[in-house]
């Protein structure tokens, strides 16, 4: 069975990567787990000081849309870490690819 992997590449405001990582680990990641979002991998990029990545697995494009609408529309997100996290982000790009289970497992951290 293939899965849909969303890869987000964040360009963070200069000097905010450590704070972004802390906020992700302490607040966003636990929330994603509570919302049953399968986080495959995440972390600071190795190529510069202002980049970060997030990879999430979904069963279908419809599952991704529903999951994101539910999570980002929730009071927990909007009244929780949203503003602090967004304050660190200058820009981001996302794309979705389809991968088999073996490849997805190989990407997990």
PLM regions with names:
Residues 22-40, 57-95:
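An amphipathic, aromatic/His-enriched active-site/gating alpha helix that lines ligand/cofactor pockets
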Residues 4-8, 20, 32, 51-56:
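Short, structured motif recognition centered on aromatic/hydrophobic residues
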Residues 2, 38-53, 78-109:
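Glycine-rich beta-strand-turn "strand-cap" elements at beta-sheet edges
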Residues 18-20, 64-66, 104-106:
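Short acidic, gly/pro-rich beta-turn/loop elements at beta-sheet edges
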Residues 12-14, 60, 98-101:
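Non-catalytic surface loops within mature trypsin-like serine protease
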Residues 15, 27, 47-49, 62:
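Short alpha-helical
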Residues 11-21:
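Short, surface-exposed ligand-recognition loops at beta-strand->loop->(often short) alpha-helix junctions
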Residues 9-12, 46:
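Short, histidine-centered active-site or binding-site loop motifs used for metal coordination
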């Amino acid at each position: 069975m293939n899965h849909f992997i969303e890869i987000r590449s964040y360009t963070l405001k200069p000097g905010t990567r450590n704070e972004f990582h802390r906020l992700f680990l302490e607040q966003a990641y636990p929330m994603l787990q509570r919302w049953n979002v399968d986080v495959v991998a995440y972390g600071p990029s190795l190529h510069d000081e202002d980049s970060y990545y997030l990879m999430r697995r979904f069963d279908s494009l419809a599952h991704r849309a529903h999951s994101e609408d539910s999570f980002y529309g929730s009071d927990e997100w909007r009244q929780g870490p949203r503003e602090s996290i967004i304050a660190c982000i200058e820009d981001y790009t996302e794309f979705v690819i389809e991968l088999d289970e073996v490849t997805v497992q190989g990407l997990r951290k």
